[in-house]
């Protein structure tokens, strides 16, 4: 607390110093027309634009003067005020500048803050890049005004040029978008028209009671991750009043949360930090922020794509109980869907790409919400941003935040549902290509700004600043969730993974898969929520580990279990997280009995879910061998079943070797008996002993001749003695020769 008050005291002392400094980045003059940027991009109101041009002894240019400047080579990728319009001069078509259009592109929305163009009648008729050294018509004031020329030269003077008190002391300041040529509600499509950010009611057929809420909330920050061939870019947003003074005195926790790291799977990634810490491209943005505007013929070098979500967060807990009927007018119509149509333009210095899509203005969860509707579940439709492809890039930005009014365990009253379901479409007069820019929204719970649904036009930036939780999204995937034609048959899920999610989503392995179904009269089932502890974090910040990205950090993972009373079907959507890669999957299990169990194994954990009407929370850990759950509705506590031990492979191999040895021993024993019946001699004669040993002296010649000896000898040759026969056995066989005399 002492640290907080110390920072607060220093901040209060230094805020006047930081606010008393204005940097004006100007470009070369083309037929007297030049571009002026104040501090960050898009931080000049229409009244201030006129005062600023007057301070430069200039005026707001007319359309004819802009066209003349365009004819001699003046083009930018910045929306700026001229007389009666907000325009971008474009010579070369670029998919992310002016929606791939050329000429003086007119933006129909001109009620917010942009840059400005000025016309100096005394300037040369051609290109003039001489340095501007002062504001000739500025009057005395306490503001330090720094003029930054295109070549980087700086000239400082004290004074003031603003005459409107609202410009000097804005009562409703808005953030400037220093990362993009346009913001979501100012984006445009081909043909010179735009879709404003406004609330649209899309009731389900047979529903004729559209509803809308006047409650406002803050817009969460959005990060667009773009890939053209092999590069990855992350768009960021900053505030005008934040400079290095503010950065020095930010709490360390807030600094840690100001990082967004992205990586596209399968590509060589360039990592851009979403905070103010310098790295390859963010530092370049800071330099441009201080040195020059980035207008001119090489404007494409200054821009990285960024979008701002118009999806509000969840209601305040106390206000939600009062205003629930605004979100859900009747318990019998939970199918009413509220969508916000948003057009989005990402500007890089060569052009503008228009996006259009449907964003859900439903409550955006800061991982855990503290409000809930006790009886009804309100499904909301999938939010999409429709990308306008170009000759080199096709960009898709999606964001979806879903929440369901169900009881939250341990007293929390809302379960968030959030996913990034992406459907791509085409904007007018645009062509498809094969190099997509894939967008991913990074919700920041404390970085949001309010959007009034009754106001069709939102400010380009919200009032919040980016000091909330950090959710890093690496790689990308798109999920198409389609409701079935029959409201009682559930959902059709099409999961299309384009790469592994090395999700440093905080890398929170945190991504929920939400459902949108029709025909539910009153769904009393509560969502099933899992909290996963990931012990395997891989940062993708080019070898640097994010300071707030510690191993074992805990994130939230939601799964939703819904029941269909008419068909007695239970469909469970459960995110499955891999401990090694952080990849996600959704398992849809349909069972005939509403009380059946759905088993899920999470990286070694085996959790059993009992969709029996209560809120079942399962806490899993990748390092633990078991998991446990608790059911809010009763005293039952379920634990995962113990996995049956398996026979190890080494034991199987050992048993096989023993069997083989036994067979070999039997074979050897059998072969050792081969000598039986092979070493016998049969001798047939009339005397004793062998014929060779007898002397024929006792026989006369005729008798010896008449006697016939039969000497049968069955023996092996001496060259191949039996190796199994010993010497004793050989002698015994010789003495046991059978002699038969005839």
From Swiss-Prot:
Positions of the UniProt region annotated as Stem: 224-649
Domain Link as annotated: residue spans: 32-120
GO biological process: cartilage development; cell adhesion; cell migration; cell-cell adhesion; cell-matrix adhesion; cellular response to fibroblast growth factor stimulus; cytokine-mediated signaling pathway; hyaluronan catabolic process
Modification comment: Proteolytically cleaved in the extracellular matrix by specific proteinases (possibly MMPs) in several cell lines and tumors.
GO cellular component: apical plasma membrane; basolateral plasma membrane; cell projection; cell surface; cytosol; extracellular exosome; focal adhesion; Golgi apparatus
Record's subcellular location: Cell membrane; Cell projection, Microvillus; Secreted
Cytoplasmic side: 671-742
Membrane topology category: Single-pass type I membrane protein
Residues annotated as signal peptide: 1-20
Topological domains, Extracellular: 21-649
Entries under PROSITE patterns matching the protein: LINK_1, LINK_2
Biased composition (Low complexity): 179-189, 386-396, 422-435, 502-516
Stretches for region Disordered: 160-189, 261-285, 372-558, 590-642
Binding-site residues for hyaluronan, renumbered to this chain: 41, 78-79, 105
Modified residues (Phosphoserine): 672, 686, 697, 706
Residues covered by region (Required for interaction with EZR, MSN and RDX and for co-localization to microvilli): 673-691
Domain description: The lectin-like LINK domain is responsible for hyaluronan binding.
Function in brief: Cell-surface receptor that plays a role in cell-cell interactions, cell adhesion and migration, helping them to sense and respond to changes in the tissue microenvironment. Participates thereby in a wide variety of cellular functions including the activation, recirculation and homing of T-lymphocytes, hematopoiesis, inflammation and response to bacterial infection.
Record-linked PANTHER family: CD44 ANTIGEN, HYALURONAN RECEPTOR
Subunit structure: Interacts with PKN2. Interacts with TIAM1 and TIAM2. Interacts with HA, as well as other glycosaminoglycans, collagen, laminin, and fibronectin via its N-terminal segment. Interacts with UNC119. Interacts with PDPN (via extracellular domain); this interaction is required for PDPN-mediated directional migration and regulation of lamellipodia extension/stabilization during cell spreading and migration. Interacts with RDX, EZR and MSN. Interacts with EGFR. Interacts with CD74; this complex is essential for the MIF-induced signaling cascade that results in B cell survival.
The protein's name in its UniProt record: CD44 antigen
Source species: Homo sapiens
Origin organism lineage: Eukaryota, Metazoa, Chordata, Craniata, Vertebrata
